[in-house]
């Protein structure tokens, strides 16, 4: 996809409206995880160093088009200022005279944060008039919030079509990584899709089987595929009503030349709790009272061999109930092997989705993957092959 890049922009003295994701977790008015603030720092610093007036647009929570004082972004200004090591001015609105006054007072290289864009109903309606009001305070637009790119909102889509628009540095890095994983990957490509339900990942599976050489299915959704293949999964989580759909995906994979890797052995227990008695069984030997909670060692060995044979890995969803040891072993083994291959340059390893990020953190390897996306819904919709409005609006 062709985009303008910030290094080609004339920035000195220009007002740069920058869409960031500051929808941070908060407890008692304090930010408990500042990852999203830190993700925006390179773009803010770059623009500031080039003499731009940096004006930050963001949403927080779901005020539904009304001013809700406890959903104000005012609390972000001070921690952001500390991270940047420079003052951050706060405007009590994102449009109108209050916003204009703060921007007018900025010196070149200065930074301002506007109030929650979702305090205006026009934001989530992608309203052209509201976008035009936002645009009054900018000479150019930068979107650095890939995590909000699947939403066609005024600050992510309509605004990008009014001003000269650019992806921010974090957005560009995400787009480059995703292109390397699915857009234009080195083959063979292996996908790992885990999680509990087939029903939540139907579009994902249908899209991936047409693009991958191998697809390993794990987690609770693997039970549905085993059930569809007339294999008894005992007392395991299983969407029996999705059996026909699972068979359709098996047929789609066969037609596309994608090799499906389903569990051949599993780790079972009678309940999900730490320290419970766990057993490894061949999938054909699962007992009526067994609950499948992880992939077995033979299944993992097959998966690692597929990794060794691949040049690209894309991963979404854990292979078992990784939060409860010992049912984390398959996920941890696969994650560590992928990280080792990525670190040595043998594979491009891209992962994303909330549970996946948590699983890689649990395995202690998220820093060794080529790229780990924290974008959640946007990452999933991209994997499903859907157009992301906030990305397509940036195309030249």
From Swiss-Prot:
The cross-references to Pfam families, in alphabetical order and at most eight, read:
PGK
Pathway(s) this gene product operates in, as recorded in its UniProt entry: Carbohydrate degradation; glycolysis; pyruvate from D-glyceraldehyde 3-phosphate: step 2/5
Report the catalytic activity.
(2R)-3-phosphoglycerate + ATP = (2R)-3-phospho-glyceroyl phosphate + ADP
Q: In which family does this protein belong, per the annotation?
A: Belongs to the phosphoglycerate kinase family.
User: Which keywords appear in this protein's UniProt record, sorted alphabetically?
Assistant: ATP-binding, Cytoplasm, Glycolysis, Kinase, Nucleotide-binding, Transferase
Chain sites annotated for binding ATP: 201, 323, 353-356
Q: Does the keyword Calcium apply?
A: no
Q: What is this protein called?
A: Phosphoglycerate kinase
- UniProt superkingdom: Bacteria
Residue sites binding substrate per the record: 21-23, 36, 59-62, 118, 151
Protein location:
Cytoplasm
Q: Matching InterPro entries, A to Z?
A: Phosphoglycerate_kinase, Phosphoglycerate_kinase_N, Phosphoglycerate_kinase_sf
Annotated Gene Ontology cellular components are:
cytosol
| One biological process term in Gene Ontology | glycolytic process
Q: What is its main location?
A: cytoplasm
Single GO term (MF): ATP binding
Q: What is its EC number?
A: 2.7.2.3
Q: How does it assemble?
A: Monomer.
């Amino acid at each position: 996809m062709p985009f303008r890049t910030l290094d080609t922009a004339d920035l000195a003295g220009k007002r740069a409206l920058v869409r960031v994701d500051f929808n941070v977790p908060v407890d008692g008015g304090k930010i408990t995880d500042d990852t999203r603030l830190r993700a925006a720092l390179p773009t803010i610093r770059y623009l500031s160093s080039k003499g731009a007036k940096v004006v930050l647009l963001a949403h927080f929570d779901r005020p539904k088009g009304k001013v809700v004082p406890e959903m104000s972004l005012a609390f972000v200004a001070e921690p952001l200022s500390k991270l940047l090591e420079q003052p951050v001015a706060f405007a009590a609105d994102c449009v109108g005279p209050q916003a204009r006054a703060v921007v007018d007072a900025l010196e070149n290289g200065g930074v301002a944060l506007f109030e929650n864009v979702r305090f205006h109903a026009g934001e989530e309606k992608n309203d052209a008039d509201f976008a035009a009001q936002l645009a009054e305070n900018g000479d150019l637009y930068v979107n650095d919030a890939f995590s909000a790119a699947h939403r066609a909102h005024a600050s992510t889509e309509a605004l990008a079509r009014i001003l000269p628009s650019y992806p921010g540095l974090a957005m560009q890095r995400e787009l480059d990584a995703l292109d390397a994983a699915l857009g234009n990957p080195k083959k063979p490509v292996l996908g790992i899709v885990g999680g509990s339900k087939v029903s939540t990942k139907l579009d994902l599976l249908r899209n991936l089987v047409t693009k991958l050489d191998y697809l390993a299915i794990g987690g609770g959704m693997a039970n549905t595929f085993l059930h569809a293949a007339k294999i008894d999964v005992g007392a395991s989580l299983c969407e029996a009503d999705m059996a026909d759909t699972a068979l359709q995906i098996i047929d789609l994979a066969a037609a596309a030349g994608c090799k499906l890797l389903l569990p051949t052995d599993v780790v079972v227990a009678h309940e999900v709790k730490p320290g419970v008695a766990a057993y490894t069984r061949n999938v054909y030997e699962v007992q009526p009272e067994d609950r499948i909670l992880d992939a077995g060692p033979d299944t993992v060995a097959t998966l690692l061999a597929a990794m060794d044979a691949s040049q690209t890995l894309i991963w979404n969803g854990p292979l078992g109930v990784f939060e409860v040891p010992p049912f984390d072993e398959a996920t941890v083994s696969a994650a560590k092997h992928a990280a080792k291959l990525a670190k040595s340059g043998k594979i491009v390893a891209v992962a994303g989705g909330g549970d996946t990020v948590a699983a890689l953190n649990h395995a202690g390897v998220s820093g060794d993957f080529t790229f780990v996306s924290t974008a959640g819904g946007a990452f999933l919709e991209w994997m499903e092959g859907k157009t992301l409005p906030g990305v397509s609006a940036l195309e030249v």
